[in-house]
Every structure is written in structure tokens, then in C-alpha cells.
């Protein structure tokens, strides 16, 4: 293709055989007209140069008396070995093959000078009118040799055309002569990119096993060297220089290619000039030719192999290489092998570590302290698997005085806690309660007629407590039946954890201990018990029962001390109400101690309130118990004063502020939604 005019040089109609040629790279060829005097007549190495007579006549047509031979150089500097550097001294003149005449189909061809050369250059134009038919035949032969010389090898070595006498028409296929130009050296194929891409993919699949074998071996061995390497399944017409060339059947195409190559006359035989710039040597005739993409793949793979050898890496066996990065696990105790991929809901490693430690702590607690005092499983279940009820965070495992039922498998030494002995609780318990009896099994208040099977069930390590034990501090369900079966204590029975208002009522001090002794607790029979099974008992844990009794005794003691103090200070004020059982008890107790009626202690100078108020009798009215409880709830507290308290009622009425309401708001509250004026 001409660089300036963009016309295909090979589009000349006479050159229809050369249309399959591909022109590598820059298709503008530079021709040096080398001076061929009689002293420079021997161009061949061995044979002398002899010109035919009509050729000498053709030389006479040209204006200088020297003979010219054509050298073709493809897009690179001229070989330094052939010519000296001084162009002007030797009188070289550079010409370019004009493509315009060739494209217009004229039988003549022109040698045009390049633009950048000296002004000394002369333009030689060989017109058809100047030459006779014999000269035209010679010119045609020369032009055909030039076109043949343009089929240069891909390794961009220089092909020099050298003349030898031959009169035969080059188009007539004579006996093929052996020339240095083999058909696998000449690359005549136009690049078909779709075919090349498919060939590239098939090469990749073929070379997966051995990636460093040269890609040329992946081509089928049956393809003839002259034939195109594009897949033959595509019967589209080939593109040659932008023109569609119909593909002949394959065998004929191969024969034509052979004729085209081997029918070069000997005076236009192509000789490969050794160029120091050209790297690739002549390929051996056995290897099939290589497409450009294959060559790029091969070079890239060789480059990668060289880099691997330099850096000491082993050969890549596969395209997907797995690189192992040595890591150190964060937590060596946790085995994360079961969950290799992190799920979204999975906790972090530290949370997992805490969970593991908590579970371990629960296990140790359960191993240490499955004690008798809890809800023991019946012994007909005790052979089965242990129920999943945990006792992890309760203080009962520490406070329980029972011996370790599972001392056979000891817990870690760190988690062993010294138990608080039950004798330490004894001074704090109320004097009316009997001494704590701790049987060998640690069951509180258990009847001595307990059978050995039930004792075994009580001491079995399977005994666990319901997880509701934290809300029920005594370990007993808060039911009225259970409270009814409980023996009455000295103070009115309250819901546990709730301080009743009766604790702070002003009453005289009682000094009477409860008469009846502490009864053993009657076990309650629940409705869900199996008929054939032994009774499933819910028993209080000893430690929680100790805490409960201590709390009740402390409350009772506080109440008694408060009443004693009030009674000593203001004896006339507090007249007990006769309607309560506890008040009858307290009155009888105060009568028994001889503190009845009004009295004043005038001897002691420290009781000044009694001196002041000794002659005045104040009475405190208890809240009216006859009112239903719903009505008492309706009375609102005002300014922090309980309206059910009879003392403060007058003060409350005195300081109560009447609400100032809008008239419309009052009508709205009295459900008068429309005024009379609107009607």
C-alpha cells in the first residue's frame, strides 16, 4: 500500500497473481539504483553477469550509460554491509514505485524520487510510447520480479534481487528451480482477526498442560506450509489489501503458490542478505509458519520462563496458582476449622472466646454444685441423660453447705470457693426459730422417715434447680397454696421482696415469742406428677432459705426496735387498734410488760418531749379499712402526701390548689359540647 496515496500497489490488473501477497509493516519500498559499470558487472558470487541484447538496448533508453539493478528494502535502514555511507559520492539515486499509474491500470510504471532527497536526483519516467513491445515485455518481467521481491520474510531481513539472464516468460511455469526462498519463509496471509482469536483460544486450551512449548507446535501438522493457517471452516473470501479475493479450492491454491514461488527467473533470484540488525535466523523448512499472535504468545511465555528462572521460581504448572501465606491463628484455643467462611451473624473471636469461657464456667459450676436442696429429679429419671437446666450464675453454688456430690471428678483449683458454714448464720436468725438441722444429705427440715431411694434422688448429682430461682428468692413458687401451708411467723406474711406499709405502722413494742414451734414443711403434691413415679418434690435450696430467714428476722428486729423506741418516747399517742390480730398480740405483750395506759417519766431530764406532752393524750386514727380498695386507689396523692392518711387530711385540704380551668374546658369535661348561643 502506498503511504501517500493509500492505493494498493498490487491492485494492478496484470499482477492478478500477486494479489494474495501480504506486505509487512510499512509498504513503501525504497529502490536504490546502483551504478553498474563494466567494472561492477559481476554481481553474482560465482557466475558472471550477462545481459541480453534487448536488455542492453533498454539500457540505452535510459539517459545514463549505466545499468541498474533493483534492491528492495522494507521499511528499515539500508544494509551497511553492501554500500558505503557516502551516498552523494557514489551517485545513488532513490526512487519510489509510483502507485498511481499502477492503480489506473497503465502498463507503464514510474520511478519517482522521494521527497526528502537531494535536488540532484532525476526522475525517470518510462513511457509506453518510448519503448517498443520488446522493451515492454522486459519491463513487465522486471515489474513482476519486483513484485516477487516484495514478498519478504517476516523477520525483516533484506531481500536483494540479482539479475541472471533468463529469456523465459516468468508466468509460464517451467521446471521449478531450487531457490533459497522456501514457501514457509514467505508470509502471504492477510490477518483474519476472528480466526486468529479463535486460534488463540484453542492454543490456550491446548497449551494448558505444557505452557512453555512453542505455540507453533499446537498447529495441526497436516496443513501445508504454503496454505493459510486460518481455520478452513470459514469459507469467507480472504481479504488481500482491502480487496476480496475468492478462495480457490485448497489443492489448487497450494499448487499456484508453489508455481508462483518457484517460477522466479534466475536473474531475479532472491538472495537473503545478512543484516546485523535482523535477529531471527532462517527458519528450518520443517517447522510450520507462525501467526503474529502465536509469536506474541510464545515470546511472552518465554519471557515469563526467563523471569522465573532468574528469580528462582519453579515452573508454573497451571494457570491458577495457589499461593500459601503462612499465618498465625489469633486464638489457638478456638478451632475455627468447622466454620471456614465467616457468616454474617457469627460473633467475633473475642465474643466467641467469652462464650467458650462462660460455658466452661457453667460446666464447672454444675460439676461442683449440683446439690441436694434443689428441685431434685426423681430417681426413675436419674439413669437418663442429664436435663439441660443450667445453674451458672447463682450464688447458691457458693453458699450451699452441702458436701460436693461430685467430688469424684474435681473442678479446677481456681474455681473452688470456701463454703460459708451454716453456724455462721445462727446468731442472725430470730430466737424463736429452731436450730438449723443439717442432715447428712443437707436437706433442710426433711422428715427422718425419708426413704433411702428418695435420699438417693436428693443427693444425686442430677438434681438441678429451675432457672426461675433468681426471681423467686426462696426457690419456691409464689402460690397461695404454698403460703397457706407455711407456718405463720411473728410478723404478717408479706410477698417476698416487698416491704409492706404495716412495717412502719406505729405500734407498741411486742416482747412475746411465737408459741408453736417450727413445723417441718409439708411437701406439696403437684398435678403433673406421674402416677407410678415417686413424688417429685420441689424443695427450697438451703442457701436461699437461709438468706430468706435472715432477711425476715432482720426486718422483724428492725420493726420491734422501732416500736420500742416510739413506745418509749410517745406512749400516750399510740393507742393500738383492736381489730388486728397482730395488734392484739402486741397489746397483750405490752400489758404483760406492764406498759399500759398513759405514763410519764418525770425523773429523767433527757425525755423532754414526755415532759412537754405528758398530760396531753394524742390519738392517731388508722385509715378506714371499711372502704373498698378500689375507692382508696382513686384518691390521688397530692404534694407527696398520702390522702388515705388521716393525720394529714386537714393540711391537705388547706394547701390544695383549685384548678383554674377555662369555661369552655369545664363545659367540655361536663360533656356539654355545644353552647346554647350556637343553637
UniProtKB/Swiss-Prot annotation:
GO terms for cellular component: actin filament; cell cortex; focal adhesion; intracellular membrane-bounded organelle; plasma membrane; spindle pole centrosome. Residues 545-569 form a coiled coil. Residues 151-182, 206-245, 360-419, 447-494, 557-598, 622-643 are annotated as: Disordered. Keywords: Actin-binding, Cell cycle, Cell division, Cell junction, Coiled coil, Cytoplasm, Cytoskeleton, Mitosis, Phosphoprotein. GO terms for biological process: cell division; cell migration; establishment of centrosome localization; establishment of mitotic spindle orientation; mitotic spindle assembly; organelle localization; regulation of protein localization to cell cortex. Changing residue 397 to D: No effect on cortical localization. The modification Phosphoserine is found at residues 78, 156, 214, 284, 348, 382, 394-395, 397, 400, 430, 471, 541, 543, 575, 582, 586, 675. Residues 360-371, 557-567 have a biased composition (Basic and acidic residues). Changing residue 394 to D: No effect on cortical localization. This is Mitotic interactor and substrate of PLK1. Changing residue 172 to A: Almost complete loss of CDK1 phosphorylation in vitro, loss of PLK1-binding, no effect on cortical localization. It is found in: Cell junction, Focal adhesion; Cytoplasm, Cytoskeleton; Cytoplasm, Cell cortex. GO terms for molecular function: actin filament binding. Changing residue 575 to A: Almost complete loss of CDK1 phosphorylation in vitro, loss of PLK1-binding, no effect on cortical localization. Its main location: other. Residues 153-163, 472-482 have a biased composition (Polar residues). It comes from the Eukaryota. Changing residue 382 to A: Almost complete loss of CDK1 phosphorylation in vitro, loss of PLK1-binding, no effect on cortical localization. Plays a role in mitotic spindle orientation and mitotic progression. Regulates the distribution of dynactin at the cell cortex in a PLK1-dependent manner, thus stabilizing cortical and astral microtubule attachments required for proper mitotic spindle positioning. May link microtubules to the actin cytospkeleton and focal adhesions. May be required for directed cell migration and centrosome orientation. May also be necessary for proper stacking of the Golgi apparatus. Changing residue 395 to A: Drastic reduction in PLK1 phosphorylation in vitro, no effect on cortical localization. Residues 401-411, 583-593 have a biased composition (Low complexity). The modification Phosphothreonine is found at residues 164, 172, 179, 219, 224, 287, 377, 577.
